[in-house]
UniProtKB/Swiss-Prot annotation:
This protein's name: Methionyl-tRNA formyltransferase
Family statement drawn from the similarity comment of this UniProt entry: Belongs to the Fmt family.
Cited PANTHER family: METHIONYL-TRNA FORMYLTRANSFERASE, METHIONYL-TRNA FORMYLTRANSFERASE, MITOCHONDRIAL
Catalytic activity: L-methionyl-tRNA(fMet) + (6R)-10-formyltetrahydrofolate = N-formyl-L-methionyl-tRNA(fMet) + (6S)-5,6,7,8-tetrahydrofolate + H(+)
Protein encoded by which gene: fmt
GO cellular component: cytosol
EC number: 2.1.2.9
């Protein structure tokens, strides 16, 4: 039986882990990020990978920093056949990568070399890409720079957001990994080096990116809204208050009104953006309120806004 050290943290990693278990791989350990305090009550939350591991009675390691840790020494001493990572979220030292008998393999949520880094799925949406996919790759010291074992593309639908793409890609990642592992194990796999001239990076989303700017076109704003749904969410600043926008669509009409102005508030709630473009807001969350569809917003708080009023803070 082929032994695996599995490393993953978010929901994206769970189908990959469960796929390995169901396919009969021996999971020696699951390595995931430490538990975190979340919400106003600061409750301790386990990572999705840890929850899945405990369900299957697998040993779990959660080093704050893997490099130089006692946990890393434990993992090296396991002499596993494979390391498999899926959105683990930490740097893996070369010493550890080289400690396995066969290979260290990563399931990455983009078509490398496009979107190396921590937010490949979000950047495919931010940039309005029409497709994305999964890369099964060899892990090396440099981030996401290893040779490619296999790739598969999927179409990005207009209604997709980060949440739906994460779900689709985690299933695709599981399936492509399980299809590719036998040829990695028996040595017959053909590796393709990444083209260094085509490398694009996707660094983690910053707090600044969460705020929608009226210098954006409606399409750019909508792409950002999709990229930040369900977490952390994009927002406009309206009269000094955060106004989250969970879902929107680019309107078919244009407007000569100043960007940040209410274009319509009867039957729809539309705001002007750069280049005379208009965005229809479909699901919103005013500061201190729950998420609501636009009909409920217009029946309540939204009824105070009038067409032609500049409401978005610059």
């Amino acid at each position: 039986m082929t032994s695996v050290i599995f490393m993953g943290t978010p929901e994206f990693s769970v189908p990959v882990l469960e796929g390995l278990i169901e396919a009969g791989y021996e999971i020696r350990a699951v390595v995931t990020q430490p538990d975190k305090k979340v919400g106003r009550k600061q409750k301790i939350a386990k990572t999705p990978a840890k929850i899945a591991a405990e369900k299957h009675d697998l040993p779990v390691l959660q080093p704050v920093k893997l490099s130089g840790s006692e946990e890393m020494n434990q993992l090296i001493d396991m002499h596993a056949d494979l390391i498999v990572t899926a959105a683990y979220g930490q740097f893996l030292p070369t010493k550890f990568l080289k400690s396995v008998n066969i290979a260290a393999v990563n399931v990455h949520g983009s078509l490398l070399p496009k979107y190396r880094g921590g937010a490949p799925i979000q950047y495919s949406l931010i940039n309005g890409d029409k497709e994305t996919g999964i890369t099964i790759m060899e892990m090396v010291k440099k981030m996401d720079a290893g040779d490619i074992y296999a790739q598969e593309a999927i179409k990005i639908e207009p209604e997709d957001n980060a949440g739906t793409l994460f779900s689709k890609l985690s299933i695709l990642g599981r399936d492509l990994l399980l299809k590719t592992l036998p040829s990695i194990i028996d040595g017959s796999v053909k590796k393709t080096p990444q083209d260094p001239d085509k490398v694009v990076f996707s660094p983690n989303i910053t707090k600044e990116q969460e705020r929608l700017s009226i210098d954006m076109t409606a399409e750019q704003a909508n792409n950002m809204i999709r990229a930040l749904n369900p977490d952390p969410g994009a927002y406009l600043m309206i009269n000094g208050q955060r106004f989250k926008v969970w879902e929107a669509e680019v309107a078919s009409d244009s407007s000569s009104l100043e960007a940040g102005t209410v274009v319509a508030n009867k039957g729809r709630f539309a705001i002007s953006f750069a280049d005379n473009t208009v965005l229809n807001l479909l699901e919103v969350q005013p500061s201190g309120k729950k998420r609501m569809n636009i009909k409920n917003f217009l029946n309540g708080q939204g009824s105070k806004f009038v067409t032609g009023e500049e409401i978005v803070d610059k």
